[in-house]
A protein has these predicted regions:
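Membrane-helix interface segments
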Residues: 3-7, 139-140, 218-224
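Membrane-interface helix/loop boundary segments of multi-pass membrane proteins
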Residues: 199-228
Length: 229
């Protein structure tokens, strides 16, 4: 399967799911239902598109991390079911958390994501590499550095906001609050437990589509076009 067909198949899966679920989300909105489960499910579509492309384009002898793929598809199916059921059989809000189906969906992300990651880590190196999922030491280090940079920029932005409003004391009081140091580890743990949501977009857009667009429109043009898409 050539590159053009792969891109078309990727778009077909990704935007096909988006279109169908978008119609259902619109129906739910006009019915006054909570539609928070739909955007969360939508974040999984791009990676699903890549997996379908890899399965369709692979050679007979080529091995892929099928256990990981199957688990991912199961997670996708369950999250889509939760989204659809949220407009058919609304469960109501869980105090302080969100709509019932959204809460169930969150558990699907966590349990399914952890299971998928374990199955991926157990795969042989060459099988993971065939799907672009073999994370090397320097890649993990780079990822941590980027996360630290994001945190630093967020704090700087927050500081500038307080400075412009003349509330520098209030900014300092944020770091004097013990609850901050309790919540930070929780947020980090939650980030890794729910990684599958972010993986869905990064694997689809960054890993698969961005290199194709950069090849055709240049490094900057490809990134800009990806942002538009």
């Amino acid at each position: 399967m050539n590159e053009n067909k792969q891109v078309k198949l990727f778009f077909g899966v990704n935007f096909g799911l988006t279109l169908v679920m978008g119609i259902l989300m619109g129906i739910g909105y006009f019915l006054g239902r909570d539609i928070s489960s739909f955007p969360a499910a939508q974040m999984l579509y791009p990676a699903a598109g890549v997996m379908v492309v890899l399965l369709a384009a692979r050679e007979k002898e080529q091995k892929l991390p099928m256990k990981f793929f199957v688990t991912y598809f199961v997670v996708l199916a369950l999250t889509v079911i939760c989204a659809v059921l949220s407009i058919i059989i609304p469960l109501g809000n869980v105090i302080g958390v969100g709509e019932g189906w959204y809460v169930i969906q969150s558990y699907v992300f966590i349990v399914g994501g952890v299971a998928a990651l374990v199955l991926l880590l157990l795969e042989k190196r060459e099988i993971k590499e065939a799907a672009g999922l073999n994370f090397r030491g320097h890649q993990v280090k780079t990822s941590f550095l980027i996360m630290l940079l994001f945190l630093l920029l967020y704090v700087v932005r927050l500081l500038l906001s307080y400075l412009l409003e003349g509330q520098i004391r209030e900014f300092g009081s944020l770091f004097a609050d013990p609850s901050l140091y309790i919540m930070l580890p929780v947020l980090v743990i939650n980030y890794f437990l729910s990684y599958i949501i972010f993986f869905g977009e990064e694997y689809g857009w960054r890993y698969f589509l961005q290199p194709v667009l950069q090849k055709r429109f240049g490094l900057k043009g490809g990134v800009l076009l990806l942002g538009v898409i």
